[in-house]
């Protein structure tokens, strides 16, 4: 129930941001258009955003015949977590990473890159997929997928405002400063919304994943490996769709500046330290 409240609050916040942007670009008419656009995006995000994200990454669905070891691993972990079997996808990318998406546990999907399967041991891979299934169990996946879709739309509108400006109620060109302000501030606002919901979720998914797998140390060593390997391997699809970065187990973006300042993931060192403490004490609270 609480996650439905968070989802509703997220949709309301992003709708309000759309309306503000619309008003800055086109006055009251722009606000009306932005409201209608936001309502349409909310509907689309709920029903179709997971399919869009998987398509962005050219993810290929696999089964017990095409990826038997990986598929059986996910099935065993889903059983341990008392979850329905999610759809399982592979992404042909060297960069090691993984994510979960969908609107609820009954309509969930997990995806991993071919790179992460090469880099991690079987135990470490179990830790990673348990982390992703924890996102499913906690019903984080709808929030993260909607946020990725809407943040991408906000960036597109900001770019439109920067290059084409807008019109006021009388059809005259809007203040160009407003367009520049929208282009600069809208992506920051979108990033702040992502930050507000992403960092705490990752700690909770680490804890939940450690409970599902029963092996917090393997998730800790997996995070360390992913962090080290990913630093030297660009993730092209993620760079092209930066709004989806917060869905990943590890931030896949390599840019500096705002991308580091507004990182949607907590520090890897802190995540590892918390997991190693769980391994030492045997406590997951």
Curated annotation (Swiss-Prot):
Its cofactor is Zn(2+). It holds the Pfam family Peptidase_M48. The keyword Cytoplasm does not apply. GO terms for biological process: proteolysis. One of its GO terms (cellular component) is plasma membrane. GO terms for molecular function: metalloendopeptidase activity; zinc ion binding. The chain crosses the membrane at residues 7-27, 30-50, 146-166, 177-197. The active site is at 132. Its main location: membrane. It is a multi-pass membrane protein. Binds 1 zinc ion per subunit. Zn(2+) binds at residues 131, 135, 202. Its EC number is 3.4.24.-. It is an enzyme of class 3 (hydrolase). Keywords: Cell inner membrane, Cell membrane, Hydrolase, Membrane, Metal-binding, Metalloprotease, Protease, Transmembrane, Transmembrane helix, Zinc. InterPro entries: HtpX_protease (IPR050083), Pept_M48_protease_HtpX (IPR022919), Peptidase_M48 (IPR001915). PANTHER family: PROTEASE HTPX (PTHR43221:SF1). Belongs to the peptidase M48B family. This is Protease HtpX homolog. It comes from Burkholderia lata (strain ATCC 17760 / DSM 23089 / LMG 22485 / NCIMB 9086 / R18194 / 383).
């Amino acid at each position: 129930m609480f996650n439905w409240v968070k989802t509703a609050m997220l949709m309301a916040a992003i709708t309000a941001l759309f309306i503000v942007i619309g008003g800055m670009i086109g006055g009251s008419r722009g606000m009306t258009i932005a409201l209608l656009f936001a309502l349409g995006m909310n509907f689309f995000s709920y029903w179709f955003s997971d399919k869009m994200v998987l398509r962005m990454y050219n993810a290929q669905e696999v089964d017990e015949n095409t990826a038997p070891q990986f598929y059986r691993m996910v099935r065993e972990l889903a059983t341990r977590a008392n979850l329905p079997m999610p759809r399982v996808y592979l992404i042909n990318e060297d960069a090691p990473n993984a994510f979960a998406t969908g609107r609820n546990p009954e309509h969930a999907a997990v995806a991993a890159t071919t790179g992460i399967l090469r880099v991690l041991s079987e135990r470490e891979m179990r830790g990673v997929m348990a982390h992703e299934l924890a996102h499913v169990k906690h019903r984080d996946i709808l929030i993260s997928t909607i946020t990725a879709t809407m943040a991408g739309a906000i960036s597109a509108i900001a770019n439109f405002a920067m290059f084409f400006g807008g019109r006021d109620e009388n059809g005259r060109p809007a203040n160009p400063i407003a367009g520049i302000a929208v282009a600069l501030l809208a992506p920051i606002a979108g990033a702040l919304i992502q930050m507000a919901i992403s960092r705490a979720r990752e700690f909770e998914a680490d804890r939940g994943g450690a409970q599902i797998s029963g092996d917090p140390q393997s998730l800790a060593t997996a995070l360390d490996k992913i962090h080290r390997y990913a630093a030297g391997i660009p993730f092209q699809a993620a760079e092209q769709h930066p709004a989806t970065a917060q869905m990943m187990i590890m931030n896949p973006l390599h840019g500096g500046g705002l991308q580091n300042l507004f990182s949607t993931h907590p520090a890897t060192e802190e995540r590892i330290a918390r997991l190693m403490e769980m391994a030492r004490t045997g406590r997951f609270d």
